[in-house]
Amino acid sequence: MSEMNFETLQTFRRELHQIPETALEEFKTHDYLLTKLKSWQQDYMTIKTVEALPTAILVYFQGTNPVRTIGYRTDIDALPIQEATGLDFASQHPGKMHACGHDVHMTMALGLAQYFSQHQPKDNLIIFFQPAEEAESGGKVAYDMGLFEGKWRPDEFYGIHDQPNLPAGTLSTLAGTLFAGTAELKVDVIGTGGHAAYPHLAKDPIVIAAELIIQLQTVVSRSVDPIAGGVVSVGVINGGFANNVIPDQVHFEGTVRSMTRTGLETMLTRIRKIAEGLAIANEVTINVSLESGSYLPVENDPILATQVINFMQKQSDINFELAQPAMTGEDFGYLLQHIPGVMLWLGVNDSHPLHSAQLTIDESAILPGYNALKSFLLWRMATSEEK
């Protein structure tokens, strides 16, 4: 039985990096993970897959003297991005890339699985390989379909996410809300088209859409507590086909984010009311779609998070920083609404942000990240208190 080393983790990461797959299509990734897990099978391990969520995998390790069941979650999907890193082990799937570091997340989860296949844990341990974090709300789907019922329900859940802005191998979290809750905004402004020379005979959806986009910026500045914060950003707008034609319709899309559930609901209500008012004032139809409920704020349990922070701050071999809240969204927040837990950042030291086609993770982060997680889990299992 050998301890995990950098070369093994690096191999996992590079092999996974080459086969990125988007939400609910992670079949090669699933097969890769399942092959590794089955090769480490022990009598005290149970590997679970389900037809209703075919790319998900759960691994249950029966503890030797359990007082709790600890859960560890990793996401497994990639993004629809054409990789532009030039790496020797770049994506082999055109138009798809692990641009959010889920290859690194999976690597550390595999490292934990291999370790606990060689060292039976004291507490029960569940490792959840979750599909569809970037889209399709995989965490919510898994929870709502009953994947965590009975012995498969953790008493507490942990997870990690890469952070390019932190030094490689640095861990970071806080006892509170780490990530924002998000809602996806889609708007259709339906007016009346016509000749651009006669705007008075049309109901110009371009002008109305522009006015609506500007008005939406007041949602944060005038309806949200400045301490709580929020974001309304429009990233897509489409309308028109000729310079001398007023179109019938304009479509735009964006994201709405808040650090609190109440703040998010306030923002969604204001967006709907502003759209309704503009529709009446301009005698047009404005259809607003706001998809929320899956990407809730990632609210770390304060007691468990304090334990994580205290443990990591006391370890001489762990570099730890207290985190600041981020407007990043993560569907782990949905699981944490039902099961207490903690998400952490892992620094991967790159000048390119998450979701960049040029994101190049510093692989020296992987081993210290894995070792910190393993050390914390072993310490947690050695404590008898419920929280």
Curated annotation (Swiss-Prot):
Pathway: Amino-acid biosynthesis; L-lysine biosynthesis via DAP pathway; LL-2,6-diaminopimelate from (S)-tetrahydrodipicolinate (acetylase route): step 3/3
Gene3D superfamilies given in the database record: 3.30.70.360, Zn peptidases
Keyword Hydrolase: yes
InterPro entries according to UniProt: AcetylDAP_deacetylase, Amidohydrolase, Bact_exopeptidase_dim_dom, Peptidase_M20, Peptidase_M20_dimer
GO molecular function: N-acetyldiaminopimelate deacetylase activity
Catalytic activity: N-acetyl-(2S,6S)-2,6-diaminopimelate + H2O = (2S,6S)-2,6-diaminopimelate + acetate
Keywords linked to the UniProt accession: Amino-acid biosynthesis, Diaminopimelate biosynthesis, Hydrolase, Lysine biosynthesis
Annotated organism of origin: Leuconostoc citreum (strain KM20)
Family: Belongs to the peptidase M20A family. N-acetyldiaminopimelate deacetylase subfamily.
Domain of life: Bacteria
Function: Catalyzes the conversion of N-acetyl-diaminopimelate to diaminopimelate and acetate.
Catalytic residue list: 75, 134 (proton acceptor)
HAMAP family the UniProt entry points to: DapEL
One Gene Ontology biological process: lysine biosynthetic process via diaminopimelate
Protein name: N-acetyldiaminopimelate deacetylase
The enzyme's E.C. designation: 3.5.1.47
